[in-house]
Structure formats: structure tokens, C-alpha cells
Amino acid sequence: MSGIWVLLSLVFTCIAGPLSKGDDAQVTDPDSEMVKLNITKRESECPEGQHREGQFCCQPCPPGKRKHADCTSPGGAPQCVPCSEGEDYTDKNHHSSKCRRCRVCDGEHGLEVEKNCTRTQNTKCRCKPNFFCHTSQCEHCNPCTTCEHGVIENCTPTSNTKCREVFQSAGSRSNLHWLWALLILIPVPALVYREVKRRCRRKENGYQKPITSNAEEVPMIKDVDLGKYITRIAEQMKITEVKDFVRKNGIEETKIDEIMHDNPKDTAEQKVQLLRNWYLYHGKKDAYCTLIQGLRKAKLSALADKINDIVQKDVTSEQENANSQNENESLT
């Protein structure tokens, strides 16, 4: 009988052991879930509209201001300071420490100010009178066409003038063609004579155009002093063209930004200073060739030809004056 009681005691002990372990497991599971929940909360993103700055999620700065210092509590507002009126702005909630620079309406490109820049709104530009642009965001406006035979539709800020066409009879068109032919042919002998004479003078002075194997024309004068032409060259170029050229020819972005910042509302001066800075950096040697060939590579051949004509005519005029002076001195 005592043996039966001993056997029953062993059975109860075996059953009670697993049950007590099961109860312990039930108790520790909630603690494990709580740890996981805390980790998930720490790793979660900030609420919508907030941004993590250091250890806290911060509110954004409102339009017209920029962040000066981070928030010091969860969900708090950072220290924000106003943008500079008329110089920079922000037009939406943001977390940046910088305002955006106001747009400049370039008068040389046919633009004028429609609405001034404020702390919360960028400058709004429009075409000047007698200029138009087809796109909503214009970098430059084109001059309106002037009609010779009447206007069908006037020029507007978004469309060019539509001119009335004059239809002529076959006889009048034929006479007009003969007239144009005469006007074109009459000056040809004089132009040929002048060109031959000029080439002879150049040959006498050892001044010849170099022969090139490629299609790109190399300037006849390689080491012309561009210093006195900088302003005239700048007048022929757009600010975007000047920035693109100097950027590709060694001027760092920080220097470009510095020049733009020093002359914020004077596009003409920005172009002059950018080109002058490049010329000082490059030096006189081959600067003229670099300018002309750089414009051609940028598919601005018409602009390169225009600048080339300005310099070539000036240099040719100086040489002709020098030759004339030498001839006068030899006669005396």
C-alpha cells in the first residue's frame, strides 16, 4: 500500500513540473512583447509634417522664414528667423536652414517685374511691351514682329504679331525678282576688289588665315587682348550662356555664385564680371581661340561669328590705319 502512495506521488510531481513551467512562460511572454513594442516605437518615423532633427521630431518653419536652430523637445517648433525682404523667400512649410534666392527679371532679355519678391513669394516676371513669349515660365522674351502691310492680330505677351500678306501678280513678282538680282549683283565687283586688296595687304604684312583640317573655324588672331572687348562681348551673350561658358572653362561654382550675389539685380554687370574673371584666370594666350571655339562647341556658332566679326573688324581697322600711316610717312 505504501508503494502505491509513493508511485502516485511521483506521477503528481511529473505532472506539476511542466504545468508550473507553462505558467512561468505565460508570465514572461507579456514582458517580451513590451520590449518589442518599445523598440518599434523608437524606430518609427516622425509624424506627418515633422522631421527628425537630432533626437527629436520637429515642426517645420512657416513660409517666409528659415530654420535657425533645432527644436528642443519632441514635436516642438524650431527657432525660425525671417528671410531677407526682396532678396530671398520661402513659399511653403519647410525644414531648411536657407531661404531661396529671388528671381531676377533680365531687362536685356525683354523681361520686367510684374510682382516684386516678398519673403513668401518669388519675383513674378512678364514680357516688356512689344515683346512676347510662348511658354508660361520665360527665361527671355522675343521682340514682336513689325508688319509692313498691316496687322491681322496684335502682339500679346504670349503670341507674336500676325501680319497681313500682300499677294502680287506674276508680272510684278517677275519685275521684283529682276530688281533684287540687280541690287545683289551690282555691289559684287566692288566687294571682290575690296577683298582682294585686303588679302594682299595681309599677305604683305605676314598676316594669313591658318588652314584647318576640321569644320570648326579657328580665329585668325590667336592672342588678341580681350580686355577692351569684354563689355561688348557680354552685350552679345545671355547670362545663361556666360555662366555655362565660364563653368566649362575653369571657373568654380563658388566663384560664380559670389559674382552673382555681389551683383544681384544687375545682369549686365554679372556677365561682365564673370567674363573678366575668366579672362584673368585664363590669361591672354589663346584666350580668344578658347572663347570662339567654346561657343561653337556649345552650338552657338552664330554668336561666335558675331563676336569674331567685332574683333576682326576692329583689328583690321587698326592694321589699315597703321599701314596708311606708314605709307604717309614713307611719302614724306
Curated annotation (Swiss-Prot):
GO BP: activation-induced cell death of T cells; immune response; motor neuron apoptotic process; necroptotic signaling pathway; negative regulation of apoptotic process; regulation of stress-activated MAPK cascade
Annotated segments matching region Interaction with CALM: 227-251
Residues on Cytoplasmic side: 193-332
Lipid anchor positions (S-palmitoyl cysteine): C200
Modified residues (Phosphothreonine): T212
Residue ranges of the TM segments: 176-192
PROSITE patterns, per database record: DEATH_DOMAIN, TNFR_NGFR_1, TNFR_NGFR_2
Domain of life where this protein originates: Eukaryota
A molecular-function term among this protein's GO annotations: calmodulin binding
Main location per the UniProt record: membrane
Residue pairs linked by disulfide bridges in the UniProt entry: C46-C57, C58-C71, C61-C80, C83-C99, C102-C117, C105-C125, C127-C141, C144-C155, C147-C163
TNFR-Cys repeat segments: 45-81, 82-125, 126-164
Topology, Extracellular side: 17-175
InterPro entries in the cross-refs: DEATH-like_dom_sf, Death_dom, Fas_rcpt, TNFR/NGFR_Cys_rich_reg, TNFRSF6_death, TNFRSF6_N
Pfam families membership: Death, TNFR_c6
Signal peptide: 1-16
One Gene Ontology CC term in the entry: membrane raft
Keywords associated with the record: Apoptosis, Calmodulin-binding, Cell membrane, Disulfide bond, Glycoprotein, Lipoprotein, Membrane, Palmitate, Phosphoprotein, Receptor, Repeat, Signal, Transmembrane, Transmembrane helix
List of glycosylated residues: N38, N116
PTM summary: Palmitoylated. Palmitoylation by ZDHHC7 prevents the lysosomal degradation of FAS regulating its expression at the plasma membrane.
Domain Death: 227-311
Membrane topology category: Single-pass type I membrane protein
Chain spans, region Interaction with HIPK3: 210-314
Note on domains (UniProt): Contains a death domain involved in the binding of FADD, and maybe to other cytosolic adapter proteins.
Main function: Receptor for TNFSF6/FASLG. The adapter molecule FADD recruits caspase CASP8 to the activated receptor. The resulting death-inducing signaling complex (DISC) performs CASP8 proteolytic activation which initiates the subsequent cascade of caspases (aspartate-specific cysteine proteases) mediating apoptosis. FAS-mediated apoptosis may have a role in the induction of peripheral tolerance, in the antigen-stimulated suicide of mature T-cells, or both.
Protein name: Tumor necrosis factor receptor superfamily member 6
